[in-house]
């Protein structure tokens, strides 16, 4: 059940296309079926980093069974993808990783 949550201080023209591409890419990177991937994109113009409102992204990737020993590789792949799609330089793109225990992810009336 991967969740990719993206907060950006610059808007994206075709959000639906971007969200769909992001879903496919996260499934590919994590080797999971896209059926359970969730992607949330939020435009928030009230977002600065290092006293600058230049384009920036804050990203959360949460997943059951996230291979924490591979977060460096996963980070590189996600940053390459997001930077190419949004134009945000990688030094202004941040990812927070969370490996969610199955008993802490509710779904379909229970937990995973």
Which ranges hold each PLM region?
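Interaction-mediating elements
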Residues: 1-112
